[in-house]
Structures are given as C-alpha cells and as structure tokens.
Design a protein with these regions (language model features):
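Conserved structural motif at the start of ABC-family nucleotide-binding domains
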Residues: 2-4, 17-18
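The feature captures the beta-strand-to-loop junction immediately N-terminal to the Walker
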Residues: 33-35
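ABC ATPase nucleotide-binding domains
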Residues: 235-266
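Catalytic Walker B motif of ABC-type/P-loop ATPase nucleotide-binding domains
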Residues: 161-165
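Conserved ABC transporter NBD signature motif
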Residues: 56-64
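Helix-to-loop junction immediately C-terminal to a conserved catalytic motif
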Residues: 48
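Conserved ABC ATPase "signature" region
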Residues: 111-128, 150
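Conserved ABC ATPase signature
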Residues: 132-136, 140
Length: 266
C-alpha cells in the first residue's frame, strides 16, 4: 500500500509539487498523466525515495518511507527508469538476474534461478535469453528491463512497482504488451504506479488515474470520473471529444479538431 499525505517539494523558490495526497491499494494500477512539466517525474522520484519531500509524508506498506534502508526497500520496491541504455554488453538472462541482486550475497540460489526463468517465460523473452542486450530492438529491451524489475519483487507480498513512461518510444504492439504485463502484476496484488503520456492507455489499463498540472493534483479517481473533457482541457489546454468503449467500460479521448484547424503553421 502507498499512502501520500500533503507532500510538497521545492527547489529554492520553485515549487515543483504542491500539497499532493493519494492512496494506492494492493492490486491497483495508478496512471499519472499531465502535460510536460506537470511534475510527474518529480512525484515518482519522491515515491521511490530518490528525493525527499519538503513537507508531508509518504508511507510504503504503512511505514514512513524515510525509515527504510535502501537495501530493505530494494527487496519489495522496484523502479523501471525511463532510459535504460547500457554501455557494456550483458546477456539477457544476466540482466534479468540483476533484479535478484538484493536477495543474495555472493551467488544466486535455486530460488533466484527459478524466479528468473519464470519471469522470462511470463514476459515472453525466453527465446533471446542468450542474446546480447544491445542487439535487441527497443521494444525487446524494454521487456527485458521490465522482466528485471519484476524479478526483483517477484513473490513479495504487496510488492511495489514504479514505471517511468514505460511505453515511451515503442510501437503500438510493444506498448500494449508492456501495459498488459503491468496490468497483470496489479491483478496479482502488486501496487503499480506508472507515468503515461497516452490518456487512452491510462483509461484502458489503470484502476485509478491522477492528473497533475504545475505540481498540483487536479483530478484523482477511476478513469470514468477523471478522464473528462473538462479535466483534459484544464491539464493539456486542448479540446477533446470523449467516447465510451462498451467492451472495456472506459472513456476514450479524441482531439476535437485536427492540428491544422487549431494551429497555423507557417
């Protein structure tokens, strides 16, 4: 469980996060959306203990985040960063095993080896287990990185997974694969928090959506309550039309005018 209570974060006079509160329960996927500069990445850094709030409290599994030592935190909290480039070569299975490093001292045990095998099967990367990571496509690399962070918290009761724009730069197929895996983890009891740029993906896959604007929470709740034309206009300064998908029971967003109708390009 994640509990955020009235957090603020400032750098000098600049207020990056202002009075944000929310909860994420085990089994929920929270999507954080907002325009560029809204404070999404800053908020995620606060949740990951990369930076500390200026004011307010963050609780992970009912314990103040500042009381956790990093080695303890690493056993049940995993983070998929936005950029995952490697300057050295690793086999895919070696990289996934890195997710188990917090759980052993010298060498992996049988449980670690089995977890890596299971996670690679679940994420569909077994076929290139012995490939050099740097020879993979962007979508394949992202699946490997997701497998690594899943392996890190695999089997941990109420594990926490933070994803920073996991679909960035991927084609439609890989975007759906990544978010389907994230959705599956939430269904198994994990708390999943993801920054997303695609409002429709947020609406389709998330249990809850939070919209940020200039570091402030302007909406939080289930997609059908949060993904409204009014909220989208306030956050992104664009007029949209909403359609309700009968199969998935979620709103879908389409810009109400083409770019050529809204903006004159010279």
């Amino acid at each position: 469980m994640i509990e955020v209570r009235n957090i603020h974060y400032s750098v000098g006079p600049l207020k990056l996060i202002e009075n944000v509160s929310f909860d994420v329960q085990p089994g929920e996927l929270l999507a954080i959306i907002g325009a560029n500069g809204a404070g999404k990445s800053t908020l995620l850094k606060l949740l990951c203990k990369e930076i500390a709030p200026t004011e307010g409290k963050i609780y992970l599994r009912e314990q103040p985040i500042e009381t956790y030592k990093l080695d303890v935190l690493a056993k049940f909290r995993a983070v998929l960063a936005q950029i995952n480039t490697l300057s050295v070569s690793f086999k895919v299975h070696e990289l996934v095993m890195m997710g188990r490093y917090p759980h052993f001292v010298n060498k992996p045990g049988e449980e670690d080896v089995q977890i890596v095998k299971t996670v690679m099967e679940e994420t569909g990367i077994t076929g290139f287990a012995n490939r050099d990571y740097n020879t993979l496509s962007g979508g394949e690399q992202q699946r490997v990185q997701l497998a690594r962070v899943i392996a890190q918290i695999y089997g941990q009761p109420k594990g926490l997974l933070f994803l920073d724009e996991p679909t960035n730069g991927l084609d439609l197929l890989y975007q759906q694969q990544i978010l389907s895996l994230a959705r599956g983890l939430a269904n198994r009891g994990y708390c999943v928090v993801s920054i997303l740029h695609d409002i429709n993906f947020a609406s389709r896959y998330a249990d809850k959506v939070m919209i940020l604007k200039k570091g402030k929470r302007i909406a939080f709740g289930v997609p059908r309550e949060v993904v409204t034309s009014e909220n989208i206009h306030e956050a992104f300064n664009i007029q949209v039309r909403l359609f309700h998908d009968e199969e998935f029971k979620c709103p879908l967003v389409i810009p109400s005018m083409a770019l050529s109708e809204q903006t004159t390009i010279k």
